[in-house]
Amino acid sequence: MSDTVTKVVADLNAAILQKSARAIAEVACKYSASDREKVRAQYRSTYSIEPDDHINKMLKGGDAATIVSNCWDELPVLRAKHLSKALKGSVDHRALLDLLIMCDREDWNNTVVAFTQQFRKNLPEELEKALKSTTSYRAFYTTWIKFDRAPRNNINGDALKLKEAFSKKDEQTVFDIMSTTVESEYKAIATQFEKVAGMTMIQAFAALTSGPLYWALHTAHYRNIGMNNGAAFLIHHACTADKKGDIARMTRLSPLLCDKCLNAKNYYSEFGDMGKDIVNAFKDAVEEVLKVLWRV
């Protein structure tokens, strides 16, 4: 962080007192989650209020205020809150893509701790309970949240193994490869699979399954290529899947990933223009905040 924590705290306070969601976003977008956490601690010490609470008090609600206040929340706690909500009643499948697929081992471990502290429950157990009636879907997420990835140095072998697994509808082998392959190998495996199988990974997923499991695998494909690719894919769907834009998805993704996925706007070119899609999908203050956070 090039500026001192004290200066950033003062800048953030000034933005909050302006009651400007855009100004608050402009401060947030300059810093990583770890730097924002330092600012958050100093803000609390200086003003005797958490910055996210101060934002909510001054801006008095609304989607834009929620997005920028979440940028100044403790992110493992924020992810835990989102997951608790997603697993209650009818499972929010879109939220699981945002919160579990777009997650790494460190984020997951911190979220499990935060979930236990917040709700006195074990997150993996709660996930399994919520998905108890969907065997294959549950098996995928149970495998995914192990976050046990390592190079195998066998691109062609993995491609052939996938070809056989898809042909035999061996879902668990597909889940294992999708959940354990490292980013540096996955794209090459997917490319080689297309050569040996005569279809893309996306086509293979569609032949294997449908519904939430298909979308989990589809999202995992882009995330395995890279976090920026995964973010671009999900933002594209947030902008185009619903007539008014999926504000809930952007509320989840933006605070958690805007610092990690600085190049998402460039990878978005596969789907269109992120800036234009945000303008078309969202309005007024929300549009402004999202454009600032995603640098478009």
Curated annotation (Swiss-Prot):
Pfam families in the cross-refs: ANXE1_4th
Residue spans of the Annexin repeats: 3-72, 74-146, 153-222, 226-295
Main location: cytoplasm
Entry's localization field: Cytoplasm, Cytoskeleton
Keywords: Annexin, Cytoplasm, Cytoskeleton, Microtubule, Repeat
Cellular-component GO terms for this entry: cytoplasm; microtubule; plasma membrane
A GO MF term: calcium ion binding
Entry's Gene Ontology BP terms: cytoskeleton organization
InterPro entries: Alpha_giardin (IPR008088), Annexin_repeat (IPR018502), Annexin_sf (IPR037104)
Functional description taken from the UniProt entry: Giardins are involved in parasite attachment to the intestinal mucosa and in the cytoskeletal disassembly and reassembly that marks the transition from infectious trophozoite to transmissible cyst. They may interact with other cytoskeletal proteins such as microtubules in the microribbons or crossbridges, to maintain the integrity of the ventral disk.
PANTHER family membership: ANNEXIN (PTHR10502), ANNEXIN B11 (PTHR10502:SF102)
Family classification: Belongs to the annexin family. Giardin subunit alpha subfamily.
The protein's name: Giardin subunit alpha-3
Organism: Giardia intestinalis (Giardia lamblia)
